[in-house]
Amino acid sequence: MAMTNREKFKVLADQIKISNQLEQDILEQGELTRIDVSNKNRTWTFQISLPHFLSHEDYLLFTHAIEEEFKEIATVAIDFSIKDTNNQDEFALKYFGHCIDQTRLSPKVKGQLKQKKLIMSGNVLKVLVSNDIERNHFDKACNGSLVKAFRQCGFEIDKVVFETDSTNHDDDLASLEAHIQQEDEQSAREATEKLEKMKAEKAKQQDNNESTVEKCQIGKPIQIENIKPIESIIEEEFKVAIEGVIFDINLKELKSGRHIVELKVTDYTDSLVLKMFTRKNKDDLDHFKALSVGKWVRAQGRIEEDTFVRDLVMMMSDIEEIKKTPKQDKAEDKRVEFHLHTSMSQMDGIPNISAYVEQAAKWGHQALAVTDHNVVQAFPDAHNAAEKHGIKMIYGMEGMLVDDGVPIAYKPTDRNLKDATYVVFDVETTGLSNQYDKIIELAAVKVHNGEIIDKFERFSNPHERLSETIINLTHITDDMLTDAPEIEEVLTEFKEWVGDAIFVAHNASFDMGFIDTGYERLGFGPSTNGVIDTLELSRTINTEYGKHGLNFLAKKYGVELTQHHRAIYDTEATAYIFIKMVQQMKELGVNNHLEINKKLTNEDAYKRARPSHVTLIVQNQEGLKNLFKIVSASLVKYYYRTPRIPRSLLNEYREGILIGTACDEGELFTAVMQKDQSEVEKIAKFYDFIEVQPPALYQDLMDRELIRDNETLTQIYKRLIDAGKSANIPVIATGNAHYLYEHDAIARKILIASQPGNPLNRSTLPEAHFRTTDEMLDDFHFLGEEKAYEIVVTNTNELANKIEKVVPIKDKLFTPRMDGANEEIRELSYSNAKKLYGEDLPQIVIDRLEKELDSIIGNGFSVIYLISQRLVKKSLDDGYLVGSRGSVGSSFVATMTEITEVNPLPPHYICSHCKTSEFFDDGSVGSGFDLPDKKCPTCGNELIKEGQDIPFETFLGFKGDKVPDIDLNFSGEYQPNAHNYTKVLFGEDKVFRAGTIGTVAEKTAFGFVKGYLNDQGIHKRGAEIDRLVKGCTGVKRTTGQHPGGIIVVPDYMDIYDFTPIQFPADDQSAAWMTTHFDFHSIHDNVLKLDILGHDDPTMIRMLQDLSGIDPKTIPVDDKETMQIFSGPESLGVTEDEILCKTGTFGVPEFGTGFVRQMLEDTKPTTFSELVQISGLSHGTDVWLGNAQELIRQGICDLSSVIGCRDDIMVYLMYAGLEPSMAFKTMEFVRKGRGLTDEMVEAMKENNVPDWYLDSCRKIKYMFPKAHAAAYVLMAVRIAYFKVHHPLYYYAAYFTIRASDFDLITMIKDKTSIRNTVKDMYSRYMDLGKKEKDVLTVLEIMNEMAHRGFRLQPISLEKSQAFDFIIEGDTLIPPFISVPGLGENVAQRIVEAREEGPFLSKEDLNKKAGLSQKVIDYLDELGSLPDLPDKAQLSIFDM
């Protein structure tokens, strides 16, 4: 008997193993009505009928299970039909995102669509969009594909239409949203309960020191013989097995409780995304949670094109964790690495120092050195990592050593330059080493009295074939040298021809090296002739030139150079250049060979020296400080294209430092290539140890034929070892590591390729991974086992043992000393408190002062308060208000010492006359500013209203021992004065800007990776690009400075006790030096003042100057001012006129679209509610999805939601919780750590409502109330001027805050301006950043115009350079507001018009330097009404 459709469905459900996961009615009433099979296309289409819609998660599970089951047979498609579609309105919204993903729309369009709201009307799905442009765009893009996707899921949808959203949604939408909102809240509650349960289970597991699943294993075991490299996966396949290491994990929970798991793995041939849906009632999730980044897995599944990311991914059916033996150092005796580069080696090293230290510790190495290029910025992290892993850290640096002065004249003789005879010569050779290469051409000309009087030109036979490089460079071929004489004959003849003439050569050290080597081999000894180097001479007398190559100089001197790199042509060109240089020297007062070095060498001579690499290793604590001094001098005093270390500087500070020879760019390695052994051994005596590195690291020199072969390289090693023996210093093998593992090399290649000017771009990068002991021993096996062991193991360990334990960062805070600081802070606090509250202070004031002063004085923080007080006082004395940031307003002592205007006491009244006071400490009032006006019951005067109810604990912690972080907002234009005042307070050498380190960001790294792959013609899938991006991210790119951070060094120490110093981004013209270490590294060791710049104090100052009103006298509770936060009526305009429901355009903190929407939702009427808004808008997950929903649902109002972090502590204490528990809860919540069981229990015991607990759990970050109160206070003052003194306000706003102006629109009538704003709103999604900035200005201008004021065009006679000025009921814009016109030109126009009126546009261009584009703009603006193009010549001018 044939099976029914329902029986077929049950069989199918059993076969795909989801019977126990489907709802009972689905299992019983579901029908498999048909299967359409296409053998040609290998597709099976299942026709399935269901009684009602599946939940979206069950739908995904069901379809995925079918696809997995039949994937090896065919590609599966499923068409659903649904019998009961009455609730399809509800399910359409849930399926919407999935159906979008099934279309072929671009990812961008898909993302935009998913944000839209829906309305079901019969069988028509309406998608609400913002404007007509969006409507047309989506309508065209979807083209029926969305309907098809919905119908395939079983929806009876005939049409999808896109409609422009109106401000008033209809009842259907409201009802639907309410339903969805209710469901979301239920899901949120369930998720919270699950989270608490999971936390409890996790805690229980931790207590028992066990895990639910120790090793991931899902599905069938995977046969290792089926594994294929990821790079071989290039198309969709039914079944593939791979293995790789995880570098990213994403677990996303679905509403059903199941998860979708996404792993990114790599086998270092390529990378791949692996996906899987966890199964219901299975422990898949526990298995996946056992995985972590860095673990290896073996996975099997179907390779398919992911329509969303448009890339191949694996839909896993099976996965298992596997063990991969990590790289090990199996040597019994381990080496010590003395040459290693971290991510602090700018755009060169890859891992941070912590990764190296962890690896070295795992390998059993006893010590490790860090030697970044030119910097020591890894030291703090190195110290922390070494302490953590129990390894000895050796601190060092690879620097750039230069001689203090490079001679221009060698072996100077008493010869008059005018009368002397010169031999200008050049050699062409088989290579660059005078020790291993040979001369193939020697050419010279003899010069006397400014004329060439003789020539010498000879080839010599090297008896070896020339390399292609030399042939291409010199155009000399083997045939040309076959019959040439021996070099001995050529040099003998040349020596006789030269006589006692002075040698002249371009880069003479190279040419003379070959001459002297040749002479010595002939037994002549080195040349005794005087020498002049035209390269160094040009660098000295032509300092304005950026280049000094022969080609460049020939052009500059007008000398013909027909064939560069042929000796005779180079020689003749050099001779004619030198003849002109002799004349230049005469003009500089140099007439004798003896005078050249004396008169031409100056203090900048170090700039001419060629830097050699040198390794500096800190031996003890004194050496650390000396290294800090060396680093600082190289970055500040001797910086020229790169930090340089003059030899004299190194000698001065070498105590406690071991000096090594570094790499192939070191002085000693170069000497081995260029000088004889006696000279090499002489140079070696300057050093404390000699470095040799694996042959692979010199491969680039061999590729460039600087080292001709392995035999030559072996000779170089032996000469270096002999030099060490002669100088009695150890020779050690170093790895010059730039990354951890071989497969990390690609990241370094990408970084180097991103720097076009980097010389490493011209060569093959060597293998520079962190080598094990056995790897190093293998690298040096050619020296013999005994010698290899000596330099790799014995010598490195002996050297490490000579180095003491060094600590690069301090373990406590060192604050400046100010005599009498404790007494002054106490006296100042009480003095000002008595001025405000009277001689008989209220007990609440005394208690608060004593509590704070005990903490401040007891922990040594008085000086910090006193410094801040003096900085603020100086600013106030100079006429600029200061706004406080952060939590300093939580301190009543800060209020009484006038560091902050925020008063943290509970709300209260004070009488300025008789000092009567009344406090409200029961939580009934949010802010003192909200108290009703009241007369003093004692004397009848109007009472002052104060107090924001902020606990002190939010500033210095519950015990009051947290180092105070006082952030102050100075006027942006006054900030430099405040910074410089710290030099007056402490001394120039005691204050520095807080340094920062800028690293490669993810987006930047993505650009580097894409650029590299494109240049190399390589295509990689997205997962591999992500891996490469991760490898490049975090590498140091530059340095900078904190915008307002000033580091203060105490008078009993100097900066080098803490950190080296430098200029930000190595900008030698910067006004301030910065700390070399990132300021976070020394944050707990030295005082950091946050002297920040802000627009609000600047704007307040301008408003004060315009109006004469003292901002401190402005009433904070002015009703008309407060009204603009809920509507624009007090501005005299309507919502329709200004296209906004509030009047807060341009009001700090309340002018953005996001906050204006909050104001519309909440309609605040009090200061405390504005503080709530400020806190809510700056927090993370405090407003959206949290307080916003609570207010909308009517659960609580604006005043009772959690807005600022301090609210939690205050509320919970009023509720009855112990202060310590209230504080602890606040700290947990504000850091996004949720609530512990102990906190929940305490809150419930004190009847804290459930919504409050739920709200706490959602919060990720919270704003301090003191910060919010300070911001709001400034905002209300500025808003007061906007309401009552509008032209002053608009003039100040446009001058201080606005930056992008559309003056042509702004001078139009109010209707035109409003239409432009409205049009820009309709196109908002398509606007760029600049257009959005213009829109912000036009919103203000539209409001100003509708208030009856207008903007004039630019006036050549009246406009100022930078400030908007008032004329009647209009504003006149400044020149700086003209697009494309800079500050200098704006100032120049003002200066030029003072000399007389502009006669024409040509005159304007000539006097003020205006471009034609700017003149045309001014013309269009109507600013040049009577100005002719050119001045007319009058008879009276003749």
Swiss-Prot record:
Its EC number is 2.7.7.7. CDD domains: DEDDh, PHP_PolIIIA_POLC, polC_OBF. GO terms for cellular component: cytoplasm. One of its GO terms (biological process) is DNA-templated DNA replication. Belongs to the DNA polymerase type-C family. PolC subfamily. NCBIfam families: dnaq, polC_Gram_pos, PRK00448.1. Required for replicative DNA synthesis. This DNA polymerase also exhibits 3' to 5' exonuclease activity. This is DNA polymerase III PolC-type. The gene is polC.
